[in-house]
């Protein structure tokens, strides 16, 4: 154990003294570093693409439901459908489907709205399972690389005839630890990115539910007048 601690200290000293570049560290990490690099690229792509998609989905005219109410009360259903089609957001498409079902039982209208809402949420969540998998899998891949590197180091020590070469041991240790660092660099942003996107989607789902309730209330207004 003492020798391992000494090797770890020597590894830090060697890395600092040698001033190894990031590329050299990456290359010494082995083929698993290329896997982590690929996962990092996938993480960035999914996060940016989903962020933009959710940002677009949340854009909605603040007077949207007021205008829908005016159209419905005035009996201008076609104009209301055209307005929803023009807005082209998950909430608008949900209300548009409800407008297209007017004249049918209220339960059918509500079911149509719920079906569209479920479909829209499913679209928004596209790619999130992959992001969650990367968040959990990247650190494990990094740890696997470290374990393989340590096994290789001890095999080299064994082949050296039992003589502990601190330089060999320390060199193998810091190279092996590179994959753990790489796994965390990929996994941590993926974890926070996933939770951030999930929170944004949940907020949008709440707005969709609120607008759905408001729309169903609007449908009852003409009958009361």
Where are these predicted regions, by residue range?
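Hydrophobic membrane-targeting segments
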Residues: 2, 6-63
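Predominantly long cytosolic amphipathic alpha-helical stalk/bundle segments
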Residues: 58-144, 148-163, 192-225
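Alpha-helical transmembrane segments of multi-pass membrane proteins
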Residues: 48-53, 188-200
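Residue-level signature of catalytic and energy-coupling elements of molecular machines
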Residues: 30, 44, 80, 95, ...
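Short juxtamembrane loops and helix-capping segments at transmembrane helix boundaries
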Residues: 162-170
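Alpha-helical transmembrane segments of integral membrane proteins
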Residues: 33-46, 132-139, 186-190
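Hydrophobic alpha-helical transmembrane segments of polytopic membrane proteins
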Residues: 173-192
């Amino acid at each position: 154990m003492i020798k391992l601690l000494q090797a770890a200290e020597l590894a830090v000293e060697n890395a600092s003294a040698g001033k190894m570049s990031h590329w050299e560290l990456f290359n010494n990490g082995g083929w698993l570093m290329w896997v982590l690099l690929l996962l990092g690229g996938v993480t960035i792509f999914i996060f940016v693409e989903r962020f933009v998609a959710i940002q677009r989905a949340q854009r909605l005219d603040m007077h949207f439901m007021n205008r829908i109410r005016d159209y419905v009360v005035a009996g201008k259903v076609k104009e209301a459908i055209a307005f929803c089609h023009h807005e082209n957001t998950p909430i608008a498409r949900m209300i548009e489907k409800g407008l297209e079902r007017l004249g049918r039982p209220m339960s059918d209208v509500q079911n149509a709205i719920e079906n569209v809402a479920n479909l829209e949420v499913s679209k928004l969540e596209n790619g999130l399972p992959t992001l969650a998998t990367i968040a959990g899998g990247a650190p494990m891949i990094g740890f696997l690389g470290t374990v393989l590197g340590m096994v290789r180091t001890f095999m080299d020590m064994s082949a050296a005839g039992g003589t502990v070469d601190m330089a060999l041991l320390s060199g193998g240790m810091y190279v092996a630890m590179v994959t753990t660092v790489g796994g965390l660099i990929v996994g941590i942003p993926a974890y926070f990115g996933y939770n951030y996107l999930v929170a944004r989607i949940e907020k949008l789902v709440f707005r969709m539910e609120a607008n759905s309730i408001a729309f169903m209330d609007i449908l009852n207004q003409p009958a009361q007048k």
